[in-house]
Amino acid sequence: MADSMFHQPVMGRRAFVGGTLAASSMAFLAACGKKGGDASGSESGSKLNFYINNPVCIDPYNVQEDQGTQVEYQLFDALTSYDAEKGEIVPLACESFEANDDATEFTFKIKKAKFHNGDDVTSKSFKLGWERLVNTKSAVATEYGPSEVSYHLSMVEGYDDLLAGNATELSGVTCPDDETLVVKLASAYADFPFVASHPALAPVPECAESDVKSFYLAPVGNGPFMMDGKWEDGQEINVKKFDDYYGDKAKID
């Protein structure tokens, strides 16, 4: 079942990184550390079990429901995030963003960061991540079928051509340098930074397309947690703290 255009996390990043324990049902997402048993995660080295239903997908290219997005919010950082306390969109993986006068072009300045495999996160990482959602001939689409969430980018210039197979890239997304991502829209949309907060629009490293099957089961992200083993359908998903995370460090390991 596809999610809404402006999906927000059931359990926020701040709560998870801070170590709040939550429960749902069936499988669980476990952040494991040196201490045994369930814990609130208030001190480093604790363990948190977060119970969720089995996700449809944990690769950004097709993350679409609450369960998948809960995993995604821990493994990946999109450009922006919704700050519930401020009631506004704020930068996350970007340092800043700005729009032109008619809200048809947005420029994002990318923070210096690393993927879990040590690769640099650049503007091209976002372009690659977005294009594999839309391109039905991408390696991941060839292996697992077209993305069901590419519509998040439907307002971007060049979307229809890439989706139809008449182009090889998303023409509305350009990378003047490694720290700058420019997005041109087909028509004005002032709330595009809100769209850019969706975890499906996270950056991906080159291995997302060069080693599709491995990435699908153990995605390599830029978020505060990284996979600890691969995802097995119907089983627990283990993650651990990413020590080289650019933002606030997790309080659980």
What are these regions (language model features)?
Residues 1-11, 20-28:
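N-terminal secretory signal peptides
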Residues 44-54, 105-108, 181-182, 223-225, ...:
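Short, well-ordered beta-strand elements
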Residues 84, 131-139, 190, 197, ...:
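Sec-exported extracytoplasmic/periplasmic mature domains
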Residues 127, 141-205:
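Surface-exposed binding/hinge segments that line
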